[in-house]
Amino acid sequence: IVEYNPKTGWAYAVNGQTGKLAAIPLKTMESKDTVDLLDANDIDIKSLVEAADTSFQYGDMTSVTISEDGTRLAVSLQAENYAADGRIALFTCNADGTLSLEKIYETGVQPDMITFTPDGSKLLTADEGEPREGYSKGSTDPQGTVTIVDLASDTVTKADFTAYDSEAN
């Protein structure tokens, strides 16, 4: 998963296994240049988040988004325990491609598809809540939700789908 920041000229590629975000200076690259993502400017999201939120154990980085004005970047992070709540890490984008951690927000289980609203006032994640062992008897089926972060008021709301439970087959 890759996002480009036209304001700074940097692209960011998710490496969920290592917990690092590869920062690629596209603005300064020439057409003859190639990028080895293994040698990119890595930002260790896993270490940054685990140091800032000691209650969270990193499992996977699933998605990245950049605000339309190019000033902020956010990533969605699943917990090591697939049935535990995930996190959003929100960063300020610096001109040199580096990121400064602003805040960490708790999400529902297995957040993915992170996005800013067009006006940049909110962050949204689809919290998948999928069972890892299938739907067999005794398996854990975490609740799916949508997390809404209001950045102005610094509040988190998790919208669930329990109102539709009566419509299940």
Residue positions per predicted region:
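Mobile, glycine-rich extracellular loop/lid and propeptide segments
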Residues: 1-169
